[in-house]
Amino acid sequence: MRIAIATGPFHPTPPGPAGAVERLTTDLAARFAARGHEVTLISRRHPGLPDQEVAAGVRHLRLQGSQSTSRVWVNILKDFPYSLSAARRLPAADVWLLNSFWLPFLAARRRRDAGARIVVAAHRYPKGQYRLYRGVDRITAVSRSVADAIVTQAPWSRPIVNVIPNPIDTSVFTAAPRDFNGPLRFLYAGRIHPEKGLEILIRGFAKAAPCLPGSTLVIMGAWEVAQGGAGPAYVEHLRTLAGTAPVTFRDPVFERTTFAAALRACDVFVYPSVAEQGESFGVAPLEAMATGAVPVVSALGCFSDFLQDGVTGAVFDHRSPAASENLAGLLVRLGTAPDLLKALSAAGAARARDFGTDLLADRHLADYAALLAG
């Protein structure tokens, strides 16, 4: 097959400072190419990366992008010129796999010339745009909660919506042995933003810390607004909130093997997101599971696609007025039960292997073949 893929305007693909979506999309593109398909990947231009190259069998085209802002409506406007440029550069293909706000709408206008089937990669919670996508052939959501939201907003789409979860590179995110006795190393990795529930996390850890002597919490992630963070003032607010609790802040890690090493160096990975209409899947908790870290997540529905409370991880009620207290109690229970942590770690690592890039690349390709046959 000839497959053309386009990511969004705000982050480059690796080896640039890619987001999770750009990273996993690049992985899928390489797997498609390795299976003999002709693959083109359109992404944002980045200093030090050529505008055109072939890498891992994938033809890369890089276009002028934009800096993201803290305002959703501004980002939607900024997406338009990039999507217009990408729509003009999409090559003739059997499948166009598109992940940008305006691009599916614009691409549908020229599909007759290119003869492509249009697949929308629904990596993010919908913002009403699916009403514009009547010309597409498939909408592939990364979680059941995203699929349900799309159908709610655009009921016409129900017959063409399916779910294929985000993949992780299980050759990089490999499990490491842990003792779980003694002080524990807690880690959050993600954007430093209020919607990630970090105030709940810091308050909860500060309450739990006296019962877990020697245990530490590291908060690692992008804080700059251009990278999706909330800016330096919010980081200082979190530092003040932490007080004397053993909490350390670190800059984001974009290089994959270094990030995997950071996950292997922690015991418990906490991802307390409160983004009811922002969280779509949760790649970071799944990658943490793959390394043997025990994931602790909020009760957002998207996490249930890979995490079962008490079996492969733990869930706390982030919607409760006592969310910090709920989290603190859970951290103490886990921190004083090493055998439970060992069981959760083993089950989580085994479950994460079901999300390997090779397995999910084959699911995508089978779906494309079915579209073309139909």
What are these regions (language model features)?
Residues 264-280, 293:
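Acidic donor-binding loop of glycosyltransferase active sites
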Residues 145, 167:
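Carbohydrate-associated surface elements
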Residues 231-257:
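Nucleotide-activated donor-binding/catalytic signature segment of Leloir-type glycosyltransferases, i.e.
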Residues 140, 177-207, 217-220:
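Conserved donor-binding/catalytic core segment of Leloir-type glycosyltransferases
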Residues 333, 339-354, 366:
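A short, well-ordered alpha-helix in the C-terminal region of glycosyltransferases
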